[in-house]
Amino acid sequence: MTSSTTGDRRWGTTRRSGMTILGKVAVPKPINLPSQRLENQGLDPNVEIVPKGTLSWGSKSSLNAWGTSSLSPRTESGPGSPSHLSNRPSSGGSVTRPSTADSNKAHDSSSSVAWDSNSRPSSASGVFPSNQPSVALQRPHSADTRPGSSQLSRFAEPVSETSATWGQHVAPEKLGVAPSKNDGFSLTSGDFPSLGAEKDTSEKSTRPQDAGPHARPPSSSGRSVEGQGVDCTEEANDRIGDANSWRRENQPYSEDAPRHCREEGQLDSRGSQSYPNANFPPRYDAWRGPPVNNHQGGGWYGGNHPYGAPMGPGGFHMDPFPFYPTQVPPAPGHGAGPRGNHANNERMFRPPMLDSYVHPRMQTRPGFYVGPAPHEGYYGPPMGYGSPSNRDLPFAGRPTGPHAYNNHSGQGGYDTPGSSVSLERNESSHSQETQRPYKVLLKHQDGRFGEDNAKREEFLGNRLPNAEKIAQQMQTSRNERREIRNDASGEVQPVKAELAAPGDPSLIQKIEGLNAKTRTNDGWQNSSSVVNRDEQESQPRTLNSGNSANKVSARNHRTGHASDSKNSSHYNQGDSATNKNAEPAAMGGTSIFRRPTQQTQGRADPQTKRIVNSEGNDAWQKTTVMSGSSHTTLATNTESFREVNVDDSLDTESIRRPGSGISADPKDNQRSTMRELARQRAQQRQKEEEERARDQRAKALAKLEELNRRSQIYEEGSVKNMEAASNASPADMPTDPGSHSSNATNSVEPTGGSGKNTTQNTRTSTEYANNVGPSQQDNLPRDGGASKQKRLGYKQKQNIIFEKKPTGSSVATAEVFDVVPSPEVVNEGVSSNNSDMPATSTVSAESTFPKRKNNRNGKKKHKAEETATMNTTRVAVGKETKSGDESIETARARAAEIELGSVSVPSLDIKVSGDSSEQISSFTNEESQNRAKNNWKSQHVRRTQRNSLVNKPAEKFSGNNAVIWAPVHPQQKADVSTGGGSQTTVPEFGTSSKSQHQGQTSSKSKRVEIERYVPKPIVKEMAEQIVSKNLVTSAPDMSENVNQKENRGGEGTGILQPSGSTAGKSGSPSKSRHGNGRQGKHGREHASWHQRGSGAPTKALEDGQFVTSNQPIRGTVNYHSSKQTEQIAAKDQTTCNKDGWNDGWYMTPETHYSAAEEMESSAVGKDQGMSMHGRQHASRSNKDGGSNYGDPKKGNKRDFNKAHTQHSGHGFSQPDLPAASKEGRVPGDHVWHTANRTGKYGGRESTRDKPYGSQEKNVVGYEHQGFTTEQKTTSADTQAQLQNRSTNKEVQVEQNPNSMFQKNTGQGRRFGRGQESQGGWGLPAQENMHHHHQRPPSNRDRQKQNLHYEYKPVGSHTYDGERSREQSKESSQTEGPRYREKGQGQQRQGGYQQQRGTSGRNGGHGFTGDRN
């Protein structure tokens, strides 16, 4: 614009007229004319170029383009553009680039660039693509600069299109006009004058800012202003079109040229302006891409291609000063230059050799690089890459190297005595010391202390004035420590001697003297404070050495032992930890306690940590052990001591250790006095804490006793334990662990006592420590990580619990539970687990605690976590096994326990069933375990996601799902076998199931742990044995088991299929092994799928706990039975139908249903939620298992026929159901029906219909409904209805699988209804539906829900089942078992049918209720 006013001297007037036209008309005619004139007149150095393209057309279009309105659309932009183009080609075209080197031309380079845009069209003819980069750069700038630039940009694209020679003409016109229209004033006053005012230095100065960086083609200096406006546009165009070619020419710089248009201002600030001389084309970092400056004349950045290898000195075009010694200060500025762009990201857009390639040594780039002298032929990365010190260092003459990129630490000093090095040393010692506990553990002797002293000395070496003093200090400290250690080691067992050790005034005095000396030598003026701290430290140490030492003695033994079992590898302390702990304790509670405190806080305090670790890594970890194991006592003591010791021990130890060898008499005396005072205080504190520890021990013993009672009392114990655990204060918790330690061993006092007792205590304490919860586990940082130890604590907890368990102290387990975070879970676990369960309870508590930890993620995570915990438990068992004999014993005991869990669990459950409370509790545990186990297996089986989903619903129904409970089911089985007792227990259980829900979680974990093991080998054995029993001993048992399994298969299939699905996975895989591979596969899928749905229905079934009663065995048996029973199913379906029906029916936890009703209601609601998950999960299953189901439909239709028959004979179909439900959801669905019906549908039904009939209906209807209903359906009416309904349902389900799947939030219901309807439920459900049509809709809905599984086989299967049932009635083998089932069912069906009629009637209500 200044150019316009200043005007081109020649065409300025014309241009002004043109400008006027442009301004008014937005017709840049004058521009083209002037620019053409200039070019034609040879004003532009690039006129050569222009003639190629721009000149000729420029001449033509000069007035024509301007004048030609038709062209003016394009010519509008064009003329101005042509001017620009002409100018740019002129500027960029020929000599401009070299002239760009001129500062003026550098300034003009913008105009030149603009001209480059013009010349670009001319260049488009191929003249100077290099100008185009600047043009392209110009464009963005002008686009940014001028409001019309966007239009210019628009036109720019056409220009790039038209950047052909004529296109240049037209496009420039277009550009010129359109901008003039849009920016008429801008183009008129600014752009066009820019074009015209190539001579205008004002334009130059104006544009050079933008163009300066671009100033490669500065030839058109006067045009720079024009270039600013139109240039950027044209540049944009050129950049779009030609810039590529231009860039190709001068790519290193051409890239920047466009950038410069965009980033012109930036680049100027970064680049050209970085260079003091505008004359020098600004250098551009390779990373930035060769700046536009790369113009022939202007490329400072003469360096190799930005990506090219760094060029040797002088290799750069602008390297006229090859290898300048870096006259410029080595570090330009941290953000200086493009290096700033490289920024600390260290992202090199270009090779590290950015400006260094251009040796920025040239002072032209003042602050930029001194130019790194190539070190060994390597140019250090541009200083800008790293922190300035690092990056600049290479240039500063410091070693260049990748460190410059990544090593910010290099700042502090490669050589820099700056604290970084010393700090690193200190930190290194610190970190080493921090790590040293492990090393020290290995050494845990004077040598270690020597190292620690050496480190301290080394550390202090920086601090201490004299190495001699340091050496003395080291010597003194070592000797002192050795003495202390020797004393301590001598007193390890008699920890109380340890008190004497800390009480030993000579040692204390020595230490104090050394510390005082150290402080004095260190010049520490705060000797008094130090002394006070030392005194305090001594006191805490003394106290701690007394109390903590005692506890450490007991707990360290405990911990040592626990550490042996759990942590021997972990700590490397193991027994040595006990020794160490005992030693440090004996050594002087001072250092021990101090270390615990320091550990607690030393961890927080690196220096203290270093010092503490240096001095007493053993003690430190011992302290950690103490902290973990003794933390109960130490929790309070350590906290108080921590307060004292943290400061005291930190400062004192820091002081003492550093200055332990140094002597300062006055301060020494003061310090000695202070230390004596501190010692006295510490002794007092020790005494207090000892008393406190005694009190806590007494409390702990009381609690242990109480816990023992509670563990024996199960539920009562659980409640009490929950209350106690919940009520237990952290101190109480520690006390509990302490008490448990002492109680468990009853020899906590073995502080100076026997190692065995101490070991037992240690174990107990360790258990407690582990179980005490995160706080103690936090204190257990032995691992070096509180969180790790927390988690490890869980694992360790499990391991320890197992240890205890092998030790046979259920009480210890109970104790652990008490200490375990979740009183409910723990208590339930404890209460539910007497002997076998304690480990399970521990696992449950442990699982629960991880759950709590993971509660943040919710149900899914909890279950997955339960599963993980269960897995961890297993792992823990393995770890225990690894850890030692005790661990092995634990593993063995656990294995036996697991066997009991599956095989013995029935007896255990039966045993428990003798005590309905216990049974409930155990049942709950088993439930929980089954559920968790199912989760675990599912998770374990790769169903984790689904299982997680299932686990969520299951988590919702944690109680209910737990109620599905294979182990309990074995109890129930036994109970069922027992008869009403089981039934009564089941009702109790059902009644208690809610309360059990709480405990079930822990129980679930426990039982999961048990079942976890049970399902695989034991479940096999159980399956075989139980199947054999069921087959051989009694078809009723088998039927019962099968019914239970089937119920459980509904649930157990749902849950067992988590568990039985897992069992179906492990069990169904066994089935697969047994030849039910499909089912196994589907079972696995179904397992997770089923778990979900199963979890809900299972939970519902949990409500309908008859399933529970059947289910425990079924959980156990279901694996086998689902495997073998599935095989046997056909055989034993009749038997299963009898017993299974009786069981399934017999299991009639009508009472359970009452409890189950409530549970059911919640379970149903949960189930629905679960169904939603189940839906999704089922949806997945349909996706996964849907096709699988498709296949299973066939196989599972078979199986379903089998399983359906079995399902009718519910028991074997249920075993199949894990697979069949998985594969052919019908049995599974049927089971689910039963589970859902029973649990959910039937549960409510039964809950409503609590009447046995309802339960039976649910149970029998579930397990037998296919069967029993078939039996009843034997009535053509019912059967026809059922078939029709099944068909209809099947059709409906098929029609509505997704709708129902999506529709029925309660997939459990869907499972229940759909599965019921479709699954063997169909007939009974239809019969029930027949009796109660409300229920049929529910069944339909559930069928739909089932269909959500796409279990056409389910619906079809149900239909098939019905037909199969009919056929079974007609046919006897596959259908024979069905028939048998039916027959048996029918046998029962008389009563069952009656009851079922009642149940159907009631069930109708129940179904209505369930639906409601």
Swiss-Prot record:
Mutant phenotype after disruption: No visible phenotype.
Extent of Polar residues compositional bias: 56-103, 120-135, 517-531, 539-553, 565-581, 610-639, 738-749, 756-779, 829-847, 914-938, 983-1003, 1056-1070, 1106-1137, 1266-1286, 1293-1307
Domain of life, source organism: Eukaryota
Chain intervals with Gly residues compositional bias: 1400-1412
Comp. bias regions, Basic and acidic residues: 197-207, 236-267, 478-488, 665-713, 877-888, 1006-1023, 1191-1202, 1222-1232, 1242-1251, 1338-1351, 1359-1369
Pfam families, per the entry: BAT2_N
Entry annotated with the keyword Coiled coil: yes
InterPro entries, per the entry: BAT2_N (IPR009738), MOS1-like (IPR038808)
Region spans: Disordered: 1-276, 384-437, 472-798, 827-888, 909-1144, 1156-1412
Keywords for the protein's UniProt record, in alphabetical order: Chromatin regulator, Coiled coil, Phosphoprotein
Coiled coil (residue ranges): 667-717
Compositional bias per record (Low complexity), positions renumbered to this chain: 109-119, 1384-1397
One GO BP: chromatin organization
Biased composition (Basic residues): 850-862, 1071-1084
Phosphoserine found at: S72, S883
Stated role: Involved in the regulation of the chromatin structure and DNA methylation at the SNC1 locus. Regulates the expression of SNC1 at chromatin level.
Quaternary structure and interacting proteins, as annotated: Interacts with TCP14 and TCP15.
Name by which UniProt lists this protein: Protein MODIFIER OF SNC1 1
Gene name per UniProt: MOS1
